[in-house]
């Protein structure tokens, strides 16, 4: 079972994404606070991080991403950034994120991106929802 950490300051989005990912067989941890991301990354050891670009509390998603990518212990964790702003190519490249998806997103698109980034052989099989 692949572990995914979801970071978003919108608790409704956190709850929806958590339910979706659990239905697809992922082990999920969520946090609404950017500053908690580092501690949860250490304790949960996620195989992928799904994170909002703009967080209202604590550190911004771009700052967190850049810090995680510059840390030798976390630099290889794929990070998919998401935002309601669709013109985010520059922002996610600057912070060295691995991918970007615009909100609102289709479940099939989200799962496809997750599968793509977990397909390096370290992730367990992803099951589909019936």
Where are these regions (language model features)?
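The C-terminal output helix
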Residues: 115-130
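Hydrophobic/aromatic residues positioned on beta-strands within the core alpha/beta folds
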Residues: 80-82
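Active-site residues of response regulator receiver
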Residues: 52-53
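Short hydrophobic/Thr-rich beta-strand motif most characteristic of the beta2 strand and flanking loop
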Residues: 25-33, 40
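Charged docking surfaces used in two-component/phosphorelay signaling
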Residues: 15-23
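Short amphipathic alpha-helix used as the core "switch/output" element in two-component signaling
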Residues: 39, 62-75
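His-Asp phosphorelay/catalytic-motif detector in bacterial-type signaling
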Residues: 45-47, 73-78
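Alpha4 helix (beta4-alpha4-beta5 surface) of REC/receiver domains from two-component response regulators
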Residues: 59-63, 85-102, 108, 112-115
């Amino acid at each position: 079972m692949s572990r995914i950490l979801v970071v978003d300051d919108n608790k409704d989005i956190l709850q929806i994404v958590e339910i979706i990912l659990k239905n697809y067989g992922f082990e999920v941890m969520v946090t609404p606070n950017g500053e908690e991301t580092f501690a949860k990354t250490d304790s949960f050891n996620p195989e992928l991080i799904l994170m909002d670009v703009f967080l209202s509390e604590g550190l911004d998603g771009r700052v967190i991403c850049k810090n995680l990518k510059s840390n030798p212990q976390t630099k290889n964790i794929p990070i998919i950034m998401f935002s309601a702003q669709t013109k985010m190519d520059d922002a996610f490249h600057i912070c060295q994120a691995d991918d970007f998806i615009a909100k609102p997103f289709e479940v099939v698109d989200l799962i496809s991106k997750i599968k793509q980034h977990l397909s390096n052989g370290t992730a367990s099989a992803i099951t589909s929802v019936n």
